[in-house]
Amino acid sequence: MNAVFIAALLILGTSTFDAMRLWNYCTHILCTNDSDCGQSDSCRCRPPRGDDYRYHCSRY
């Protein structure tokens, strides 16, 4: 039973770490088109908002 519990924690930790890596990669990147934001479909190049004149990658 301990081995199953440890395996479950490792799987959960790995999936959480992977999601965090994708989130950090997608934010705060300047871009000109969607291909600059990487291969993820959820990470897109967004137009500027407010006082910022630059395009940036974000997940929405």
UniProtKB/Swiss-Prot annotation:
Location of the protein in the cell: Secreted
GO terms assigned for molecular function: toxin activity
Keywords on record: Disulfide bond, Hemostasis impairing toxin, Platelet aggregation inhibiting toxin, Secreted, Signal, Toxin
UniProt motif (Cell attachment site) ranges: 49-51
Major place of residence: secreted
Expression tissues: Expressed in salivary glands.
UniProt superkingdom: Eukaryota
Keyword Thylakoid belongs to the record: no
Summary of the function given for this chain in its UniProt record: Tick salivary platelet aggregation inhibitor that plays an important part in the anti-hemostatic strategy of ticks. Inhibits platelet aggregation induced by ADP, thrombin and thromboxane A2 (TXA2). Blocks platelet adhesion to soluble collagen (most probably through the binding to alpha-2/beta-1 integrin (ITGA2/ITGB1)) and binds to purified glycoprotein IIb/IIIa (ITGA2B/ITGB3) in a dose-dependent manner. In vivo, reduces thrombus weight effectively in a rat arteriovenous shunt model and inhibits thrombosis in a carrageenan-induced mouse tail thrombosis model.
Family the UniProt entry places it in: Belongs to the ixodegrin family.
Name of the protein this chain belongs to: Ixodegrin-like peptide
Record lineage: Eukaryota, Metazoa, Ecdysozoa, Arthropoda, Chelicerata
